[in-house]
């Protein structure tokens, strides 16, 4: 079974459900990621809520977090909140899920500075082949949703590929099938790759 790396559909049991700390209401049999979205970085007073939620055993990852140059608080504030998520990810030994818009330079600079031990997952990756290589070379996993660059999808190293739905109505297997076509491999092969990569990243039992 293919586990959805990132969704906002709280009814799912075959996915990592992304929620804000204020809305975190864990249910048995479900797995979550919790974080302060870059668009909400003006709300840093509830970081204490995040710290409490993140420690819950049903939380598989921290985020989504990152930097968005088109929306949210000023870049310095977003970067500061991003750094706090990194520290939390490292202290709890849970991977980090990234939301990044036109801020590749900041993300890579902070990663180089912080030297994190935990995996980073770039959710909803839509970049080109060059960007995919740059991120993969820096150890970042790339999660593809319903919109992606087909050449990039074909080029992502096998050990860096993940699949998600985010807020799309497209099913996870539908997206995986399109990725398989780009890579000229079978759907079961994509499912196996993505499942293994996610399991390794989050110690998640598929």
Report residues per predicted region.
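Mid-domain alpha/beta scaffold segments of enzyme catalytic cores
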Residues: 1-206
């Amino acid at each position: 079974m293919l586990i959805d790396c990132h969704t906002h559909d709280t009814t799912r049991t075959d996915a990592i459900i992304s929620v804000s700390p204020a809305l975190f209401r864990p249910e048995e049999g479900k797995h979550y990621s919790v974080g302060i979205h870059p668009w909400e970085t003006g709300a840093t007073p509830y970081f204490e809520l995040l710290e409490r939620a993140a420690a819950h055993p049903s939380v598989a990852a921290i985020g989504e977090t990152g930097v968005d140059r088109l929306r949210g608080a000023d870049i310095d504030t977003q970067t500061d909140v991003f750094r706090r998520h990194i520290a939390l990810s490292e202290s709890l030994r849970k991977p980090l899920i990234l939301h990044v818009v036109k801020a590749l330079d900041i993300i890579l600079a902070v990663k180089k500075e912080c030297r994190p031990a935990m995996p980073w997952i770039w959710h909803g990756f839509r970049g080109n082949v060059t960007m995919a290589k740059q991120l993969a070379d820096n150890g970042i996993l790339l999660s593809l949703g319903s919109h992606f660059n087909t050449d990039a999808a074909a080029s992502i190293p096998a050990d860096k590929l993940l699949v998600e739905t985010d807020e799309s109505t497209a099913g996870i297997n539908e997206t995986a099938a399109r990725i398989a076509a780009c890579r000229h491999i079978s759907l079961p092969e994509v499912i196996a790759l993505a499942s293994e990569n996610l399991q390794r990243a989050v110690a998640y039992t598929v």
